[in-house]
Amino acid sequence: MTETEFNNILTNDIKKVEHNLLSFLPDCKDGQESVVQAMEYSLINGGKRLRPVFALEFANACGGSKEDALPLACAMEYIHTYSLIHDDLPCMDNDDLRRGKPSCHKAFGEDTALLAGDALLTHAFEIIAMSDLSDDKKVSASLLLAQNSGVGGMIGGQVIDLIYERQNPSIKQLLNVYKMKTGALISAACLMGCISAGANENQMACASKFAYSLGIAFQIQDDILDIIGDEKELGKPIGSDAQNDKTTYATLLGIDKAKADVEKLTQSAISQLDAFEKTEFLKELALKLVNRKK
């Protein structure tokens, strides 16, 4: 696949997602404008759109339609966006900026930001329920998304990560955090794409293995970039983990070992794609994500 072909597919996928994201927003009623505006503000605030792209591309890899997967892809991005709003709150990471713009609570106030996050979370499941997919697929997608974004996935990973900020976690414990915090939502995205296309059990299993291996590699690469990344390329200061005395994979094992494990995990992820058709784009995307500079 040429660079131009890859970029065309990625651009078209992102355009499809961004065109539909706002169309799923709830209608404003008297007095509710501020929370819907905060939802919209956060949804359109850039980002890689990584998770919805995975949903669309796994639907395609299973022989399904990207159009059928679009509601699930957008629901996935609603969940991801709510998590970012809550991450930025003063009680969590206390970040004033998100992708170079004021974070939601700085733009709309803490109370509205909290409610906007809650609204995005709950509305994600309404998007799935109102889609044209079969009832079985709606139930499967909703259950999967709830499990992977809840205590058994992203939320659980956040809780454990907070605990480890006051401790010195082992590599095994760190990998579990990465699996839950990052891998779980990537897995949900890939699997929801599979669900929309009616994937078989083997494809579901392979998609899950792909997502978790890539998710962990993605997080380790983040750790590496926080040590040796270029601040101009990243668009944020480096060294925040060290300043906060936070233990990461790269600080525990060193840069060279971390880089080697990113490569190993990425190749493990790519090997799972043998269960699918039309995987050239997914292979290239996996490589670009773990070799990124920002």
Positions of the model-derived regions?
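N-terminal amphipathic/basic leader segments beginning at the initiator methionine
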Residues: 1-25
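Mg2+-dependent prenyl diphosphate-binding active-site environment of isoprenoid biosynthetic enzymes
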Residues: 15-16, 25, 29-272, 277-290
